[in-house]
């Protein structure tokens, strides 16, 4: 696994460990750093993970802080679920998207880092998260 992908997963796991201090809110600009407490939404959390890992902005905005789920769908490449790797993203719902999560472990039922309105970042299986999300799913990558 590449250093960038390892870094994205490490950042997502940092978020999971700090779940009580990471709150949900559609805040723009997206806070980019490890200062806690932190308020962000699902796409902001995914963007933060990429930023902390030193990856290019998955929103294609140069980390200006104004990316959102729709810009992830616009800028990242669709990948087949069987080709998903750690650090890739999954988006539920048609454009502009309803919810996104970071892939921690791929496989038949990928393990995700999901940050939603109900609670801060948590590790959850794709099948479990999908019970609460729209049926339309897009798997995304912008990583080598």
Positions of PLM-derived features:
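Aromatic- and glycine-rich peptidoglycan recognition patches
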Residues: 1-10, 62-79, 94-144
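Loop/turn positions that initiate beta-strands
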Residues: 86-87
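N-terminal capping segments
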Residues: 1-61, 113
């Amino acid at each position: 696994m590449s250093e960038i992908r390892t870094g994205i997963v490490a950042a997502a796991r940092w978020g999971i460990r700090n779940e009580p201090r990471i709150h949900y809110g559609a805040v723009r600009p997206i806070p980019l750093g490890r200062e806690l407490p932190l308020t962000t939404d699902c796409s902001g959390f995914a963007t933060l993970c990429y930023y902390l890992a030193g990856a290019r902005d998955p929103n294609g905005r140069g980390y200006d802080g104004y990316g959102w789920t729709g810009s992830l769908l616009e800028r990242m490449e669709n990948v087949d679920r069987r080709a998903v790797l750690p650090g890739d993203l999954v988006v539920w719902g048609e454009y502009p998207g309803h919810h996104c999560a970071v892939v921690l472990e791929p496989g038949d039922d990928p393990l995700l880092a999901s940050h939603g309105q109900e609670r801060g970042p948590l590790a959850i299986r794709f099948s479990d998260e999908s019970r609460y999300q729209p049926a339309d799913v897009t798997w995304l990558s912008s990583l080598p």
